[in-house]
A protein has these predicted regions:
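Short alpha-helical segments that sit at the start of domains
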Residues: 2-25, 88
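Short acidic, hydrophobic short linear motifs in intrinsically disordered regions
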Residues: 33-45
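Short, hydrophobic-biased segments on the C-terminal half of alpha helices
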Residues: 57-61
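Glycine-centered, phosphate/nucleic-acid-interacting loop/turn motifs that mediate DNA/RNA or nucleotide
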Residues: 67
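Short, Lys/Arg-rich nucleic-acid/phosphate-binding segment
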Residues: 73-79
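Short, amphipathic alpha-helical interaction segments positioned at domain boundaries
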Residues: 87-109
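Mid-protein regulatory/catalytic core that forms ligand/cofactor-binding pockets
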Residues: 116-197
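C-terminal regulatory/effector modules of DNA-binding transcriptional regulators
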Residues: 170-261
Length: 261
């Protein structure tokens, strides 16, 4: 257990992959290309999430190897920044994970391939966020690959779909995760006065939202309506990010020099 019941409540939502937590931290706190996070500050942040220093070192090694971050050393202190590649990856998903509103409505299409088309070719021709009700049927949005020019394509009335479509668009387990996240965020107490604790709360909450949201595309929002659990979690995380605003790095560095309580 940590010193904060609210932190414990968020940690109970699921195990943390340390390398992914570091990506969340770097992406949320290092907004400018020149921004860096020193090792002692990063250690304080992850210790507040129950992550030990050995696990952090392994995660940093992996992220450097995979091109996410780079390190500089000043005396005995290392600092870390996103590489241009890491920043590009972060910026690519920023409109999705920070959006406070659902995506703009666009038509959803049911696509059936021509009989002569191989199933794998059909799958390969569709966008990554396509959902497959069956091996030779697809739900997708946007323009189609020319390879599908002979496919049967029909635009769906998303207000008149059968109930079973929900379990095709997103798994029941993911829906339950979103419900638990929204409930946990809505039960958080007043923002604590300690900047380090506030920041750790922000980062854990945002990390859980980020890992859930990046597992799927826009189809759940387009098909399941405005009150599905993911939409409720999005509203809750937007409110949480306002309650626990992003700190200035200099203020956070100063807070990190205060011994942990």
């Amino acid at each position: 257990m940590t010193a904060s019941p609210d932190i414990d409540r968020l940690l109970a939502l699921g195990p943390l992959k340390v390398w992914s937590v570091v990506v969340t931290i770097m992406g949320d706190l290092c907004r400018a290309p020149e921004d860096r996070i020193e090792g002692p500050l990063l250690t304080r942040l992850v210790e507040g999430m129950g992550i030990n220093n050995q696990a952090l070192r392994v995660a940093l090694h992996r992220l450097k190897r995979d091109g996410w971050i780079e390190a500089e050393r000043d005396g005995r202190v290392s600092s870390y920044a996103l590489t241009p590649e890491g920043r590009a990856r972060t910026e690519a998903v920023r409109p999705v994970i920070y959006a406070a509103a659902p995506p703009a409505p666009v038509p959803v299409s049911l696509v059936l391939p021509e009989p002569a088309m191989a199933t794998q070719d059909f799958i390969d021709a569709l966008p990554d966020d396509t959902v497959f009700p069956g091996t030779r049927s697809a739900l997708t949005t946007g323009p189609l690959d020319p390879a599908l020019s002979d496919a049967l394509v029909t635009t769906l009335d998303t207000a008149a779909l059968p109930d079973w479509i929900a379990s095709v668009v997103i798994s029941p387990e993911a829906l339950a995760d979103y419900t638990r996240l929204a409930q946990a965020l809505e039960s958080l107490g007043p923002a604590p006065g300690d900047l380090m604790t506030r920041t750790i709360l922000r980062l854990i909450a945002f990390h859980h939202w980020r890992r859930m949201r990046l597992r799927h595309g826009t189809l759940p929002d387009l098909i399941l309506g405005p009150n599905w659990p993911g939409a409720q979690a999005r509203t809750a995380i937007a409110r949480t990010l306002e309650t626990y605003p992003r700190p200035a790095l200099d203020a956070l560095r100063a807070a990190a020099t205060t011994p942990a309580s």
